[in-house]
Every structure is written in C-alpha cells, then in structure tokens.
C-alpha cells in the first residue's frame, strides 16, 4: 500500500514539474509606471510556446499582440508593445507547454 501511494505521488510530481509556470513579467503584476513600456516580457520556469497574448486598456476591447516569429518553445519572451495611453492595462496570455499542457494567466499594470 505504501509503495503504491509513493508511486502515485511520484507520477503526480513528475507531471507537475513538466509544466512551465510563469516566474516573472515585465512590467510586474500591479506595477505603476511613469511611461508605457515598449515591450512586454514573460519569464517561464520551463519552455512554453505562447499562442495568444491579449492586451486590454481600461474599458476598451482587447487586442492581440503580434506573436509572428515566436514559433518555438522558449523560456523567455520579449514582445514589442505599442501604445501611448496612460491608464490600466490587463495582459492575458495563453500558451502550450512542451508536455502538451495548455496554460494561461494574466497580470495588470498601470501607467500614470
């Protein structure tokens, strides 16, 4: 019984480690900036292929960032960002881990 439980925990842990959770973003979540960033950066623990990044500025509808040229699985992304508006931004991302697991998340920042 103990062996079976230990095996199940080992299988679960190896699957959990195969995913690539988000470690860092620039701007950081809830950051307050003095100027609009020129790029959005993501840092993942393992490799991931971003499939969609949507930016929503305050009450406006979201728009997708251009991910052409980002066809590989990477740990770090720096995606060009063009805006000249102050206010609050919501960044929503979606990606695929090397193990086939779909991941997503979001973070916010504002520009004064």
PLM segments and residue spans:
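Bacterial N-terminal signal peptides that target proteins for export
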Residues: 1-4
């Amino acid at each position: 019984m103990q062996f079976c439980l230990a095996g199940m925990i080992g299988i679960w842990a190896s699957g959990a480690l195969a995913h690539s959770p988000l470690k860092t973003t620039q701007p950081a979540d809830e950051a307050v900036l003095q100027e609009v960033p020129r790029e959005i950066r993501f840092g993942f623990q393992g490799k991931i292929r971003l499939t969609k990044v949507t930016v929503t500025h305050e009450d406006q509808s979201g728009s997708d960032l251009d991910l052409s040229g980002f066809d590989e699985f990477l740990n770090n992304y720096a995606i060009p960002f063009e805006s000249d508006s102050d206010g609050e931004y919501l960044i929503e991302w979606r990606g695929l881990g090397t193990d086939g697991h779909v991941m997503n998340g979001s973070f916010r920042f504002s520009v004064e």
